[in-house]
């Protein structure tokens, strides 16, 4: 971050993380390249609108990703439903394996044999016999034609049996595509769950941060209240001390002067006269002194 001599400007917030219960943001600084990007605590971001703009962008980005995934999942679901419909249609058109061919009609009864006469000769055919034999031949020919008609679809069935492996291969390919789509859907669901968990973690972290901020505010308010209470207590103590240490001097009554008695007046007068006499006696009169110097050092005369 900036030191005391230089102030850095935040250009944009790139990422957000939680470290030791505190929010940190990856900052791109204005006028600096990506090599100067740094993780900074929330307190270092002066403008709170930058944080709000970052979380708004993150929410829009996640919503866009989720919408794209939902769209992809819906497309894959439609493709899988179409593939399953085509598979069911192909299976319906393909005959079941081991299907039995149409049963052949029961063979017609052969005409009765000619009867022999008593002499061992065969009875000649009558007109009715000839008609019956011709009718039998005709019916036999019709039966053979019917049998041929019944046998005509057999080669077609063989061809269908030969085409079954190709259809099986196509079905297997469709099954693989369906399994791949299912795996893709599972991966998408897993990614959505991871993103959802990440969003829940971010939300929990934001709630935790808000709770911590509220607790810090409560603690600060509590400390302020305690400081105010301490100041009030100190003020009360100071006032009490001032009251106790203040000295109140009582007023001293001055007695009124009374007139002295006659004896006291006499004593006072005598005292004043004696005091005056004493003062005069104690103060000797000073006269001029003349000092005469004599040649002899030992004799010094003082003349008044």
Curated annotation (Swiss-Prot):
It comes from Caenorhabditis elegans. Residues 63-235, 248-304 are annotated as: Disordered. Pfam families: Chromo. Residues 106-116 have a biased composition (Basic residues). The keyword Oxidoreductase does not apply. It comes from the Eukaryota. GO terms for biological process: heterochromatin formation. SMART domains: CHROMO. SUPFAM superfamilies: Chromo domain-like (SSF54160). This is Chromo domain-containing protein cec-1.
């Amino acid at each position: 971050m900036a030191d005391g001599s230089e102030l850095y400007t935040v250009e944009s917030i790139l990422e957000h993380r939680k470290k030791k219960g505190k929010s940190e943001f990856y900052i791109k600084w204005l006028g600096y390249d990506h090599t100067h990007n740094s993780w900074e605590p929330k307190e270092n971001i002066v403008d709170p609108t930058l944080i709000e703009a970052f979380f708004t962008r993150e929410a829009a980005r996640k919503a866009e990703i989720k919408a794209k995934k939902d769209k992809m999942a819906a497309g894959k679901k439609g493709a899988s439903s179409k593939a399953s419909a085509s598979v069911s249609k192909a299976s319906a058109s393909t005959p079941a394996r081991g299907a039995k061919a149409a049963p052949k009609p029961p063979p017609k009864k052969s005409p009765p044999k000619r009867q022999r006469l008593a002499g061992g000769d065969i009875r000649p055919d009558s007109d009715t016999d000839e008609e019956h034999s011709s009718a039998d031949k005709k019916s036999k020919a019709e039966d053979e034609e019917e049998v041929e008609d019944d046998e005509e679809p057999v080669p077609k069935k063989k061809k269908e049996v030969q085409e079954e492996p190709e259809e099986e291969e196509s079905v297997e390919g469709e099954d693989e595509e369906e399994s791949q789509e299912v795996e893709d859907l599972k991966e998408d669901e897993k990614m959505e769950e991871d993103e959802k968990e990440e969003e829940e973690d971010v939300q929990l972290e934001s709630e935790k941060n808000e709770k911590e901020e509220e607790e810090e505010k409560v603690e600060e308010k509590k400390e302020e209240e305690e400081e105010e209470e301490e100041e009030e207590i100190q003020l009360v103590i100071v006032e009490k001390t001032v009251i106790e240490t203040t000295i109140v001097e009582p007023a001293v009554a001055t007695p009124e002067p009374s007139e002295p008695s006659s004896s006291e007046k006499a004593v006072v007068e005598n005292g004043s006269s004696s005091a005056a006499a004493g003062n005069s006696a104690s103060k000797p009169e000073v006269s001029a002194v003349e000092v005469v110097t004599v040649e002899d050092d030992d004799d010094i005369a003082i003349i008044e």
